[in-house]
Amino acid sequence: MSIQKIDYEFIHPELNYEAEPNFQPAIKVSVYFKKREGITSETFFHHWQTVHADLAVATEAFQHHILRYAQHHQTPEMKERARSLGEGVLDYDGCAQLWVRTWDDWMAFYSSKEYAAALSDDCNFFMQLPMTYMIGYENLIVGDASTAIGGKDGFRTQGQ
């Protein structure tokens, strides 16, 4: 593979052209969605962080295949702050972030009849379908890794 390089003197040697990426040992699945019309943002976020999270975590498919689950709540206030930057803003209200060890783990979870039975009606209650996916690897630059999955920390900056 040929990479086009520019003439650049790196401030952080951890990031130079020869440095290996710090990919975490998991696949990160980000699932973007909007709240269903007819419900308030408060209902959407509260339902998602309580009922929906509980239903998801309670499934055996989740217990056997999901390493990490986080919710990214983009509230109306945060959406307005993002718009004030004058840049584009993703038109979603939430992003569920799930980590799995392998693609087979994701497919076992995603295609589980138990998961579908537990969450299908609930999804219809509070979110618009279809959902939008982004799937890849996390390259941790700065910050702490999840030690539970054997991740490697990023490097430290002066402010840390």
Which stretches of residues belong to each language-model region?
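Macromolecular interaction modules
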Residues: M1-Q160
